[in-house]
Amino acid sequence: MKQHHYMKYLFVLLLFLPTCLMAQNKEEKMPGHITKIQKLEDVNVTGNRPHFIRLKGYYRSYQTNDSVMKYFNDGIVEYYINLKNGKTDLNAYSKRNLHNSRLVSEDKKRAFMVSDEGTFRPWPEGKTLIEQYRKKYQLKDSLGSQLVLLNQQTIGSIQTDSSRNICQIEINQLPTYKNLTHQLFGYTQTDIYDHVVETYQISPEDYYSFKDLLFQKSDNSYLFSHKKDKQQQLIHVITELYITEKEYVEKKQSIKQDSSTPKESAAAITDFCNRNKIPSLPEATEQEMQQLTPYNPANMKEIKE
C-alpha cells in the first residue's frame, strides 16, 4: 500500500478513532467484515510454467464532503502479479464513475486547481502492510495476536484465524507520518485519520504476499481548504477491494478497451457482486450513490445516455 498520496490523490474517513484502537480488549474478535469474505475456490494452474498470478475481484471507492457523497467509483478488475519481480499489471472493465454534479459545479475555479477527489483504484504492488510493519516497528505477542507498537504505543494488530486459514493486519497509520499538514498552490490538507486493513489467505510459502490477498480496505479523513475559503471541508474516503478468483497463468491476457455504457457497467457489476456475494453498501450509502450521475474521469464531463 503506498503510504501518502499527494493532494490530488487524497483519501478519507468518517470518524476519528482513538490512536490506541486495536487489540486492547481481551474479548476482541476479528472484525465483522471478515466473516463476509468468501473463501476462494481451488486455485487453478494454467500451463506448465506459470509466470503470473491472476487475481480477479471487485473494488469500490467513494467520497463524502462534509457528509454528502461527491464521488463513487467501482468496477471489476484483474491483476496480473509477476511471480519473478512482483510487478502488477491491471485489466479493468465494467468501470463505473459517478459524481454529485451539484457539488462539482460549486467547486470554485482558480488559476491553480487542486482536485479534492480522493477516490482511487487499489493497486496491490510492492510490500504488504505486514512486510512493512514487521521491519519498521516492534511487534508484541498478545492474546493470540501480535500488537504493532510505535514508541510503546499500539497502532495496530496482526491476527490469525487458523480454523479459516486467514491472517489480517489492521493499522492506524496516522502516528507514523512525519507531517500531518501539507500545502500546495494555496490549498491545505490536514490528515486526521488513516486506517488500513489487509486480509490474506495463509499459505505455506509466504502468507503476507499480495498473491494471497483476499480483502483490502483503506479508510481515511482529512480537512481540505484553499486559503481564500472561509471554512475547511471534512473529506472522507473509503476504498475496498474484494478478491474473488485466483489462478496461476503462463501469460497475461491483452488489455481491452472498456467500451461499456454506464448502464451496461452497472448491470455487469451488480451481477458480479451478487454471484460472488460481495457485501452490500449500507442502505443510506446506497441511496446516496443512486443519486449520482455518470461522468468521464478524463474530462470530468457528464455522460448522457
Model feature map: region roles:
Residues M1-K29:
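Bacterial Sec-dependent N-terminal signal peptides
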Residues N25-E305:
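Surface-exposed, low-complexity/disordered segments
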